[in-house]
A protein has these predicted regions:
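Short hydrophobic/aromatic patches on beta-strands that form ligand-binding or substrate-lining surfaces
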Residues: 69-77, 133-135, 182, 196-200
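Extracellular glycan-recognition modules
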Residues: 49-107, 141-144, 209-210
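Extracellular glycan-interaction patches encoded by glycine-rich segments
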Residues: 173-196
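Short, aromatic/His-centered strand-loop micro-motif at the edge of beta-sheets
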Residues: 107-132
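Low-complexity, glycine/proline/serine-rich flexible segments
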Residues: 18-65, 102-103, 110-115, 176-179
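Beta-strand-rich interaction surfaces with strong enrichment in secreted/lumenal proteins
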Residues: 56-59, 119-124, 169-171
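Short tryptophan-centered beta-strand motifs in secreted/extracellular beta-sheet-rich domains
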Residues: 71, 128-139, 150
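Extended recognition patches within non-cytosolic domains
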Residues: 2-10, 16-23, 29-40, 47-50, ...
């Protein structure tokens, strides 16, 4: 599992809304179904001087051409950058997903060029909202525009201000033996101000969508609200939840 690195206080600071063990961040989907109640999250509080992050070093590299990542996140300080996915190592090559200048950025850099570089036009500034993110990297896909995909609250993101897609069989340092970090962008020494919950990484698995909706980690209830759902597929060698 990931190791917890802290400067002063633990990041396990939220025991559900209101702080009670019976309070939940999310509830099962209305009307039944596979909805999963989530009762815990991790708080990363760079402003408090804690400089917390999670780290993991794989003993062997997994599939670097195909993987999926999913999580719920909540911004606690709009206007600040923070890392979402594992990695963002300190030197080239580097890669990961972050909130950068209030936009969601999916980027990986190697040598002197970007392997992938997607910046959403949508801005992320709401400190009260929980967002569900799914990121898919699949450079084996025959369609260039499908080799890197982002989904927000179940729906595929299609509006980008910057848009560079991976070449065939391109790789990033995500899922390599390089130390993987969540909550710390080493290249700029940026720590996070946010909450994370229900984090998944799938090694060698590119989850798919139906008409732009990905249902592997969530589902819409009868009111059209996106709710968490337990993933039931393969995790691969280096996958985790």
């Amino acid at each position: 599992m990931f190791e917890h690195h802290k400067k002063e206080s633990p990041i396990l600071s939220l025991a559900g809304i209101g702080g009670g063990p019976a309070a939940y961040l999310f509830y099962e989907a209305a009307g039944g179904g596979g909805g999963a109640a989530l009762s815990r999250s991790l708080r990363f509080a760079a402003d408090a001087g804690t400089n917390d992050y999670l780290s993991k070093s794989f003993s062997s590299a997994g599939n670097q051409t195909t993987w999926s990542f999913a999580c719920w996140f909540k911004i606690t300080k709009p206007g600040t950058d923070f890392q979402v996915t594992p990695l963002f190592s300190g030197s080239s090559p580097w890669g990961g997903i972050s909130i950068y200048q209030d936009k969601l950025r999916f980027a990986a850099y190697s040598g002197s060029s970007y392997v992938v570089n997607l910046h959403t036009t949508q801005l992320f500034r709401d400190p009260n909202a929980w967002y569900h993110l799914v990121a898919v990297f699949d450079s084996t896909n025959g369609t260039s525009g499908d080799r890197a995909r982002l989904y927000l609250n179940g729906k595929r993101i299609t509006a980008f201000s910057t848009e560079t897609y991976p070449g065939p069989s391109a790789t990033t340092t995500i899922n390599s033996t390089t130390e993987q970090r969540i909550g710390h962008e080493v290249s700029n020494n940026v720590y996070s101000n946010c909450y994370f919950a229900d984090v998944y990484f799938l090694d060698g698995v590119a989850v798919t969508d139906t008409n732009g909706t990905v249902n592997s980690f969530g589902e819409f209830d009868s009111y059209g609200v996106w709710n968490p759902k337990a993933y039931t597929g393969s995790f691969g060698s280096n996958g985790y939840h």
